[in-house]
Amino acid sequence: MGSYRAEAQIAAPAHRVWNVLVDLDRWPVWTKSVRKMRRLGEGEFGLGSKVRITQPGLGTATWVVEEWQPNSSFTWTASLPGVRSVAQHRILPVAPGRVKVVLTIQQTGRFADLVERFYGKKIERYMRLEAEGLRRSLEGT
């Protein structure tokens, strides 16, 4: 089973961080870990939404939002043959106008160990890119 985590302290209130996280069209602007992100379907992004994400060197996967707590967290899952990925995005207040963003991915299934062996370092690096890119996009640094 692969387990990955990245976090960043961000000088911004939770609602601003949330607004950047749920603006799917902008992800390729603030993180190099995402080449393309496209919402499948109509309506607001939220519980049950499906998103197709293309990442350099990892290919394309469809993620489904399974948990949704506005201004706080969302969890989406993707399943490929032999591997199920569960990715959580949490925003934790640490002080007025300051939060800690915690990103986690858990991978399970018959081929999870192989994915970790061949792609684990890349997944870790991409998670750091996401956490730091989010911080930079909000702090302007």
What are these regions (language model features)?
Residues T77-L129, L134-R136:
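Beta-strand/loop substructures that line and gate deep hydrophobic ligand-binding cavities in soluble
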Residues Q9-P13, T54-P56, L92, T104-T108:
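Solvent-exposed residues in well-ordered beta-strands and their adjoining turns
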Residues M1-E42:
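Hydrophobic ligand-binding cavity/cleft-lining segments
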Residues N19-V29, G120, E132, R136-E139:
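Short, intrinsically disordered, mixed-charge
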Residues R38-V86, P96-R98, E132-T141:
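Glycine-rich portal/gate segments that line the openings of hydrophobic small-molecule binding cavities
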Residues M1-A8, R125-R128, E132, G140-T141:
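Hydrophobic-ligand-binding modules of eukaryotic lipid transfer/binding families
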Residues V22, P28, E66-Q69, L92:
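Alpha-helix boundary recognition
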